[in-house]
C-alpha cells in the first residue's frame, strides 16, 4: 500500500463509488494506505520474540491469553506505538485523499487559505498549529511507550518462535489477510487498469513515460540518500545513548513527517522571497 499514493487510492474509490465523501471514506482510505506503518514494525518484533518468554509463563500456570498479555504484548507495545505515531503523522500531513473526498483537515484548509487570501499570515498560523499537533502526538507516543527495557538471563541464544497450526481458524485468518490486500492493493490497481482501458483519450507516449520514470527514480534515490545520511546519526545516537537530549532529538525527527508538502512549499517560497 505504501507504493500507492493516498490520492490515487482515493481517486480509484471515487471512480467506483462517486458518492463517497466525508470522514468515513477518508478514514478508510488513509487506514488502508497506512497499514504497513504498523504491520512492518510489529511483524519485525514478532519474528524476533524468544518463545522462552511464553514457555516460562505457561509453565507458571498462565493460559494462552494471559501469557500473551504478560509476555508478548509488552514487547510489541513500543513497535505498535511507533507505528501508530507514523500513521498519525502521515494522516496529519495528507492532502490529496482528504481533498478528493471533500473532508476538511488542516492541510486542505491551509491550501485553501493560501490560494484564496492575499495575506499568507493565516496559512502560516495554521501551519504552526499543525506542527504543534504533531508535537503533541510525538509526546503522547513517548508517554505511552514508557521506559521499555528487556533483559535475558542465561548464556543461551534466543530461539525463533515456532509456527502454531491455526486449525479451523486457518481459513478465516487467510480470508482476513486476502481481504486487506484486496482493499489496499488489488482494488486500486484493478481500477487504474480499468480506467486506463476505458479512456478514449489515452495515448501511449514512451518518451514521456521514460522521462517521468527517470525523474521519479532520480528524486526517490536522492531523497532516500539524503534521508539516510540525515537519519543515520540520529539512529545511532538514539540506540547508544538514552539521555534526555537524545530522546528530544529523536522525537524532533518525527515531526518533519507530519509536515505536508504544501507547508514545506510555503516555507521555501517565503524563504526565497525573504532572501
Indicate where each model-derived feature is located:
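Membrane-helix interface/capping residues of multi-pass secondary transporters
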Residues: 53, 62-64, 95, 120, ...
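Membrane-water interface segments at the C-terminal ends of transmembrane alpha-helices
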Residues: 1-47, 73-96, 123-142, 168-197, ...
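Flexible interhelical linker loops that connect adjacent transmembrane helices
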Residues: 144-177
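Peri-membrane helix termini and adjoining interfacial loops of integral membrane proteins
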Residues: 101-107, 148-157, 193, 197, ...
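Glycine-rich helix-loop "coupling/hinge" segments at transmembrane-helix boundaries
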Residues: 92-118
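Glycine/proline-centered hinge or cleavage motifs at structural transition points of membrane proteins
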Residues: 60-62, 74
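Active-site-proximal cofactor/substrate-binding loop regions of enzyme domains
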Residues: 11, 64-67
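Conserved MFS/SLC helix-loop-helix module at the cytosolic interface between two early adjacent transmembrane helices
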Residues: 49-59, 67
Amino acid at each position: 500500500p505504501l507504493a500507492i499514493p493516498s490520492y490515487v487510492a482515493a481517486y480509484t474509490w471515487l471512480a467506483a463509488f462517486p458518492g463517497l465523501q466525508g470522514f468515513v471514506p477518508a478514514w478508510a482510505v488513509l487506514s488502508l494506505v497506512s497499514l504497513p506503518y504498523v504491520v512492518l514494525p510489529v511483524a519485525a518484533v514478532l519474528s524476533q520474540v524468544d518463545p522462552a518468554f511464553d514457555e516460562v509463563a505457561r509453565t507458571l500456570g498462565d493460559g494462552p491469553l494471559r501469557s500473551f498479555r504478560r509476555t508478548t504484548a509488552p514487547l510489541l507495545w513500543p513497535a505498535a506505538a511507533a507505528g501508530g505515531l507514523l500513521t498519525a503523522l502521515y494522516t496529519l500531513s495528507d492532502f490529496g485523499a482528504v481533498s478528493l473526498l471533500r473532508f476538511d483537515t488542516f492541510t486542505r484548509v491551509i491550501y485553501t487559505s493560501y490560494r484564496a487570501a492575499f495575506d499568507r499570515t493565516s496559512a502560516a498560523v495554521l501551519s504552526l498549529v499543525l506542527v504543534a499537533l504533531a508535537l503533541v502526538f510525538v509526546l503522547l507516543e513517548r508517554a505511552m511507550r514508557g521506559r521499555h527495557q528487556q533483559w535475558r538471563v542465561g548464556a543461551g541464544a534466543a530461539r525463533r518462535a515456532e509456527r502454531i497450526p491455526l486449525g479451523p481458524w486457518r481459513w478465516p485468518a487467510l480470508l482476513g489477510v486476502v481481504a486487506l490486500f484486496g482493499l489496499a492493493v488489488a482494488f486500486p490497481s484493478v481500477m487504474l487498469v480499468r480506467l486506463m482501458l476505458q479512456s478514449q483519450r489515452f495515448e501511449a507516449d514512451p518518451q514521456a513515460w521514460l522521462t517521468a520514470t527517470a525523474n521519479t527514480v532520480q528524486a526517490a534515490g536522492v531523497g532516500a540518500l539524503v534521508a539516510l545520511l540525515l537519519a543515520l546519526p540520529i539512529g545511532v545516537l538514539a540506540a547508544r545513548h538514552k539521555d534526555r537530549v537524545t530522546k528530544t532529538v529523536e522525537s524532533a525527527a518525527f515531526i518533519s513527517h507530519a509536515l505536508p508538502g504544501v507547508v514545506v512549499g510555503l516555507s521555501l517560497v517565503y524563504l526565497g522571497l525573504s532572501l
